Swiss-Prot record:
Residues 312-715 are annotated as: 3-hydroxyacyl-CoA dehydrogenase. Disulfide bonds: none annotated. Heterotetramer of two alpha chains (FadB) and two beta chains (FadA). Keywords: Fatty acid metabolism, Isomerase, Lipid degradation, Lipid metabolism, Lyase, Multifunctional enzyme, NAD, Oxidoreductase. It comes from Pseudomonas aeruginosa (strain ATCC 15692 / DSM 22644 / CIP 104116 / JCM 14847 / LMG 12228 / 1C / PRS 101 / PAO1). The gene is fadB. This is Fatty acid oxidation complex subunit alpha. Residues 1-190 are annotated as: Enoyl-CoA hydratase/isomerase. The record marks 120, 140 as: Important for catalytic activity. Pathway: Lipid metabolism; fatty acid beta-oxidation. GO terms for molecular function: 3-hydroxybutyryl-CoA epimerase activity; delta(3)-delta(2)-enoyl-CoA isomerase activity; enoyl-CoA hydratase activity; long-chain-3-hydroxyacyl-CoA dehydrogenase activity; NAD+ binding. Its EC number is 4.2.1.17, 5.1.2.3, 5.3.3.8, 1.1.1.35. It catalyses: a (3S)-3-hydroxyacyl-CoA + NAD(+) = a 3-oxoacyl-CoA + NADH + H(+); a (3S)-3-hydroxyacyl-CoA = a (2E)-enoyl-CoA + H2O; a 4-saturated-(3S)-3-hydroxyacyl-CoA = a (3E)-enoyl-CoA + H2O; (3S)-3-hydroxybutanoyl-CoA = (3R)-3-hydroxybutanoyl-CoA.
């Protein structure tokens, strides 16, 4: 053995070729943490010092190669002063460069996935051979940063600027055949042949059949582009990528700038350029928010995994109520491999549900994401019915009938009589109390909420709601089923609106206040979209449905009269009374026309302003900053209350719920991280400036205490 550590070993194979093997003890995957980096330093030094070594193959002892840097460790480094962070980055890069500069040929054998630092390790090798099932990529831009272990330097010199920009700026994972096509790898082989193929490549290089020094040379030099070619390549790329990423996500454009700036330098100077840009991005609030999101998501997955021990296996599911929502739930279940009964009392409802599922599956086939055979398999997994005949075999039932407590209670009691005693029943209600609905059931311990968001196939969040009498098996099974459907479940406790709608309606409350002061809803939408929301509150109201918003507002006002009840009529009341229900009937705040693709397109409608005139109580001058504060303060404070009331267990879950459920701007990290970014004391002071607007703007006593003590929600 040439070197043995806890993450890396180097052992002789044959003919002077050694295997540098990554196999991090106690972990299911390999990652670059401090231990792995320090051992790589030692392993490279050991290889360099051993005159008998004639070649190196780099392998993994796990099912994947290396998933990248351990962000939980490296995020602490981002708090260091710029000079220290840059020095640390360059020190790590020296390890990869020293590996690249070994006198002997090096071959990386890529299995599973090689992402971020994992791919950068492979780029430092002379040759790369890849398993046909493996994927490679540089996903750092998704964390608000860019590759920091030489990725922006080596990749463009290997596969050309255009390809490298696409890989780095998109952050996507690339299949083996695509990597081979652009020249990122030298060979693709069947998984079982990977080790032998890597060894063969190394032998050929040792024998002089392959010139490893010639392969290495382009990575050490400047880019092979003249000044005009550089200008055309980089300026076009920056314009296109900036348009795609938008102004709130600087990392993709910064990556291109770094590649451009380093284009005329050799490797070592180019790595300094990369490090300087990396440090600049690491210090941005966007990077802190997106890394925070990543860590929150990891926490969510860990929590959801804990329920697996108690969860029952769901072999057959059912949905009550077809239509668009029921069809969406059936589609998602069948697509992910759980067959589902879809029951409705009307033939038209069943047809609508089947049409919805077929349409969604058809779109996947069109995009090449599903084979026609798999589409047929998924469609066969949806079994329409108008009776409870087969419900005796069902493991979980999702009730998705009309949002009316009496109707839901009647349907739930009916289905309870048709299923086996240990079947789980879940209601897809968005606002009705789970404990109230449970009163109609004989086995309330088997009942919980399972709130999907519309459209089901696009929205990742599922709220799993625990009622007063809900048992752990019901929660665990519902969480496991949601995960199996490809969703991100969050367990919340019962209250009006649960987590997401409880937080959303105060946001709409802020919108109502602005409208009552005569502020143009088109302006409000523009300001909030600029803030980072996918759509402004007027457009969102139209998409959700004014009638849905009207009903939800009444439920929330009843549940929280101290701050959500309103005096007199608001915008949603007059819109509802004028039968302007939003997209569903072609007129709401906006009017809707059908575009060439048959999709609704919003246009301003003077009639909407006439409808709103009676609710304007005064004309008030407000700045764009005021608009943001009117909207965001109530949303943030209600999120704080949900955490304090135990509706949601952790700050991470609260923030992820808003990002996955209502499209809270990811680069701002969630409502609680947004408060942290302003500063808790500063946020409390800001809210106090708007105190005259009512209780929605009044911080809680506990938040004031946090402000006084200098506390934060994260870190």
């Amino acid at each position: 053995m040439i070197y043995q550590g806890k993450a890396i070993t180097v052992k002789p194979l044959e003919g002077g070729i050694v295997e540098l093997n990554f196999d991090l003890k106690g972990e299911s995957v390999n990652k670059f943490n401090r231990l792995t980096l320090s051992e790589l330093r030692a392993a490279v030094d050991a290889i360099k010092a051993d005159a008998s070594v004639k070649g190196v193959i780099v392998t993994s002892g796990k099912d994947v190669f290396i998933v990248g840097a351990d962000i939980t460790e490296f995020v602490d480094n981002f708090q260091l002063p710029d000079e220290e962070l840059m020095a640390g980055n360059l020190e790590a890069n020296k390890i990869f460069s020293d590996f690249e500069d070994l006198d002997v040929p090096t071959v990386a054998a890529i299995n599973g996935i090689a992402l971020g630092g994992g791919l950068e390790m492979c780029l430092a090798a002379d040759f790369r051979v890849m398993s046909a099932t493996a994927k490679v990529g540089l996903p750092e831009v998704k964390l608000g940063i860019y590759p920091g272990f030489g990725g922006t330097v080596r990749l463009p010199r290997l596969i050309g600027c255009d390809n490298a920009v696409e890989w780095i700026a998109s952050g996507k994972e690339n299949k083996a055949e695509d990597a081979l096509k652009v020249g990122a790898v030298d060979a693709v082989v069947a998984p079982e042949q990977l080790q032998a193929a890597a060894l063969d490549l190394a032998k050929r290089a040792v024998a002089g059949e392959l010139d490893h020094k010639a392969r290495r040379q382009p990575k050490l030099e400047k880019l092979k582009l003249n000044a005009i070619e550089q200008m055309m390549a980089f300026e076009t790329a920056k314009g296109f990528v900036a348009g795609q990423a938008g102004p709130n996500y600087p990392a993709p454009v910064e990556a291109i700038k770094s590649i451009q700036k380093a284009a005329n330098f050799g490797r070592d100077k180019a790595l300094e350029v990369e490090a300087a840009g990396f440090v600049k991005l690491a210090k941005t609030s966007v990077a802190q928010s997106l890394i925070g999101l990543f860590l929150n998501d990891q926490e969510l997955k860990k929590k959801a995994k804990k329920y697996d021990e108690v969860a029952k296996d769901v072999k057959l599911a059912a949905v009550l109520g077809a239509g668009i929502m029921g069809g969406g739930i059936a589609y998602q279940s069948a697509l992910k491999g759980t067959p589902i009964l879809m029951k409705d009392i009307r033939e038209e409802g069943i047809q609508m549900g089947l049409n919805e599922a077929a349409k969604l599956l058809g779109k996947r086939v069109e995009k090449g994401r599903l084979t026609p055979a798999k589409m047929a398999e998924a469609l066969n997994g949806i079994r329409p019915t108008m009776s409870y005949g087969d419900f005796g075999n069902v493991d979980i039932v999702v009730e998705a009938v009309v949002e009316n407590p009496k109707v839901k209670q009647a349907v739930l009691a009916e289905v309870e009589g048709a299923v086996k005693e240990d079947a789980i029943i879940a209601s897809n209600t968005s606002t009705i109390s789970i404990s109230l609905l449970a009163q109609a059931l004989k086995r309330p311990e088997n009942f919980c909420g399972m709130h999907f968001f519309n459209p089901v196939h696009m929205m990742p969040l599922v709220e799993v709601i625990r009622g007063e009498k809900t048992g752990e098996t019901a929660i665990a099974t519902t969480v496991a089923y949601a995960k199996k459907m490809g969703k991100s479940p969050i367990v919340v406790n019962d209250c009006p609106g649960f987590l997401v709608n409880r937080v959303l309606f105060p946001y709409f409350g802020g919108f109502a206040k602005l409208l009552s002061f005569g502020v143009d809803f088109v302006r409000i939408d523009k300001v909030m979209e600029k803030f980072g929301w996918p759509m402004g509150p007027a457009y969102l109201s139209d998409v959700v449905g004014i009638d849905t918003g009207h009903h939800g507002r009444d439920v929330m006002a009843e549940g929280f009269p101290d701050r959500m009840a309103v005096e007199g009529k608001t915008a949603v009341d007059v819109m509802y009374e004028a039968n302007r229900l939003g997209q569903k009937n072609g007129k709401g705040f906006y009017a809707y026309e059908t575009d060439k693709r048959g999709k609704p397109k919003k246009v301003t409608d003077p009639q909407a302003y006439e409808v709103l005139k009676p609710i304007v109580v005064e004309q008030r001058e407000v700045t764009d900053e005021d608009i943001v504060n009117f909207m965001m303060i109530p949303l943030c404070l209600e999120t704080v209350r949900c955490l304090e009331d135990g509706i949601v267990e952790t700050a991470a879950e609260a923030d992820m719920g808003l990002i996955y459920g209502i499209g809270f701007p990811p680069f701002r990290g969630g409502a609680l991280r947004y408060i942290d970014s302003i500063g808790v004391a500063e946020f409390v002071a800001l809210a106090d400036k708007y105190a005259e607007l009512g209780a929605l703007y009044h911080p809680t006593a506990k938040l004031r205490e946090m402000a006084k003590n200098g506390q934060k929600f994260f870190g």
